[in-house]
A protein has these predicted regions:
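C-terminal segment of classical bacterial N-terminal signal peptides
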Residues: 2-9
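N-terminal extracellular ligand-recognition/capping segment immediately after the signal peptide
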Residues: 31-37, 53-104, 124-130
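Extended beta-solenoid/beta-helix repeat architectures
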Residues: 38, 76, 113, 140-145, ...
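Short, T/G/N/S-enriched strand-turn elements that build extracellular solenoid repeat scaffolds
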Residues: 41-50, 67-76, 91-92, 107-111, ...
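All-beta strand scaffolds that present successive hydrophobic residues in beta-strands
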Residues: 61, 80-83, 114-121, 142-146, ...
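Internal alpha-helical scaffold/solenoid segments in large eukaryotic proteins
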Residues: 62, 78, 142, 150-157
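Glycine- and acidic/polar-rich repeat regions and solenoidal domains
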Residues: 95-114, 124-136, 150-160, 165-167
Length: 168
């Protein structure tokens, strides 16, 4: 992926962009789902390690259909942008979301867990695995926009609990 930096005018927030390029994610192949998880989670982990309240990370996905086989963990001060022609497909069995806030082995109370997370766009296909597509708990400032969540069975599309300032 590539990394660039830009500045925003509102509240002096700066942004660093991670653009996952064409060819970095696999649409087909025996190991496509696990390879895709590695690429995407590496971008999320870079944001986890470097993003701050005034230096946030924006991650962009290319157009295409990309399978994953485990839950992706997004962290504070990260914005995820998917084109309307981008689809994430969860191949894992029940118990795996497509994305959730952080690592739930971390214990949080009230709203002190994760903050400033935005997800914008894309199609999110759960393939009827019995889990929710997105899961967030103990967050502040969560925004989810322009998403199309499909093929949910016996679960919520989005699960958000103990979230202060939620916009869907």
């Amino acid at each position: 992926f590539s990394l660039t930096g830009t500045a925003a005018f509102a509240a002096e927030i700066k942004y660093s962009d991670i653009v996952i390029g064409d060819g970095e994610l696999s649409e087909t192949g025996e190991n496509a789902a696990s390879d895709n998880v590695k690429v995407i989670q590496a971008a999320f982990d870079e944001a986890k390690n470097k993003a701050r309240d005034k230096n946030r990370y924006r991650i962009y996905f290319p157009k295409g259909e990309y399978h994953i086989n485990t839950t992706l963990n997004i962290f504070s001060n990260t914005e995820l942008y998917l084109d309307e022609k981008t689809t994430l497909v969860q191949d894992a069995p029940k118990g795996q979301n497509i994305v959730k806030a952080g690592d739930f082995s971390q214990k949080h109370i009230l709203y002190n867990g994760f903050r400033n997370i935005k997800i914008d766009g894309g199609k999110w296909d759960m393939q009827f695995n019995g889990s929710c597509a997105m899961r967030f708990g103990h967050c502040t400032n969560l925004s989810i926009r322009n998403v199309n969540i499909t093929n949910i069975m016996d679960a919520h599309h989005i699960e958000a609990a103990a979230v202060d300032t939620l916009s869907i």
